[in-house]
Amino acid sequence: DRQYTRKGERTNTNIMLEHNFIFGGFTLSAGVLANKNTGLDNDFRFYPGVDMSYRPNDNWKFYASWNKALRMPTYTDLYISNVVQQGDINLNPEKNSTFKVGTQYRQAGFAATVSGFYAHGTNMIDWVQTSVTEQNDSKYHVMNIGKLNNMGYNVDATIYMRELVPNSFITRIKLGYAYIYQDHKTETNILKSLYALEYLKHKVVFGLDHQIWNKLSASWSVRWQQRMNGYHPYTKVDCKLMWDEKKYNIFVKADNITCHRYYDLTAVKQPGLWIMAGASVNLGW
């Protein structure tokens, strides 16, 4: 039988204060979270946040946000110990500060979004390998990996064909691209990371929805992405067939229809062709 030899206890208390201000097309939401976690001490710590948006007209929206946050190490991070994982009871909580800015545009038949972000983290927690011995044994240990800065942007554009051509058999076309740049500062030579350093640098998505016959339609998705630190870029193609009625919906979904073998975050081998089917019923309640 499995024996559990570690236990922990901590109480987390949150007090939230928020105020919303609306004037014309301008909206401001500001707040602060007071947090006390007995896993640290009995003191309250304060984490502010601000969200702003401005709509000069019905087509445009501009927005920005900033917030601070704290993440406590989990009990797995602290206590686990086996042949492939080693926790650390001396972990510090990780601290994050994130700033986002963006704009949205919408008109008949077309929508677009452009956004950017900057995230600064200290004492970031990750599972890593720092020696050849750990690599040979496929063993990871958890640690605070230092300072981590992530910055990037996202661009999305969507064409709603039936708002432009009412009888078009193509209903929607979507194209998106996301990019992330990462700057990591640490005094430890990290050979392999499971999470934080295996970031998604490039991601391109293409989507197409169209009618087939009567109430039968299809939705196609093509995704290309490149994850850093030892991952090969790959392309994944998915398709979903749907029959829509007023009272119910039936679908069949095929993920990775090219049966491409690929690995994603934490070096886990992903499934080949994956087929799912389902239905939903509208009860009219």
Tell what function each PLM region has.
Residues 1-7, 40-47, 75-82, 89, ...:
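Outer-membrane beta-barrel translocator domains and adjoining extracellular loop/strand segments
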Residues 17-21, 50-54, 101-105, 116, ...:
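Residues on the lipid-exposed face of transmembrane beta-strands in outer-membrane beta-barrel proteins
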Residues 118-120, 141-226, 280:
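Gram-negative outer-membrane beta-barrel transporters
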Residues 122-123, 239-285:
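C-terminal beta-signal and adjacent terminal beta-strands/loops
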